[in-house]
């Protein structure tokens, strides 16, 4: 009767999906916590509302959202800090890497490691920022100029962005590639 136990058939699939959900939910919890701290718990704040809407769109449970807001309003835990790293990727593409962390040194080392693994490095502050403008409501970065990218460089860029987005500390990665 081996192979007839339903749990043995679904446990590996469930483990993979649960790990993926956990990673996504922890990113959203950090984002909501940071926005709630900026808004001082005001749920009417547009940036906090946007963060909550993003979390709800990813099916994050309401309990987790409430817990993240309460964590920000209380004194428990370290303060979350938003850091923006600048880099240049394959083909001269400018990268803006938005990280949210309670440990600046850890986040910097993780981003540096991922960039160096792919043959790139963090650029000086302001060296890539000129290529982007910040949207007033969503605080997302939009490229002011775009750079055409060759096919082989595009593959390297996609791999780099994927590796950065898989990092726990990194929230978003913006590029000015066409």
Residue ranges and their predicted role:
Residues 133-165:
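Short, low-order "capping/linker" segments at domain edges
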Residues 22, 45, 150-153, 167:
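Short, structured coil/loop segments at alpha-helix boundaries
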Residues 1-144, 177-178:
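N-terminal cationic and glycine-rich segments that engage phosphates or anionic surfaces
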Residues 160-176:
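Short acidic amphipathic segments
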């Amino acid at each position: 009767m081996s192979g007839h136990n339903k749990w043995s058939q679904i446990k590996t699939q469930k483990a993979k999906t649960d790990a993926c959900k956990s990673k996504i939910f922890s990113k959203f919890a950090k984002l909501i916590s940071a926005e709630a701290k900026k808004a001082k718990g005001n749920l009417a704040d547009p940036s906090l509302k946007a963060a909550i809407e993003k979390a709800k769109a990813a099916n994050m449970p309401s309990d987790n959202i409430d817990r993240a807001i309460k964590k920000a309003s209380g004194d428990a835990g370290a303060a979350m800090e938003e850091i923006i790293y600048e880099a240049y990727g394959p083909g001269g593409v400018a990268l803006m890497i938005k990280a949210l962390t309670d440990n600046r040194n850890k986040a910097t080392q993780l981003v540096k490691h991922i960039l160096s693994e792919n043959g790139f490095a963090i650029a000086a502050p302001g060296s890539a920022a000129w290529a982007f403008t910040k949207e007033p409501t969503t605080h997302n970065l939009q490229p002011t100029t775009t750079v055409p990218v060759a096919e082989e460089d595009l593959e390297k860029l996609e791999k780099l962005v994927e590796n950065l987005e898989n990092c726990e500390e990194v929230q978003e990665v913006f590029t000015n590639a066409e």
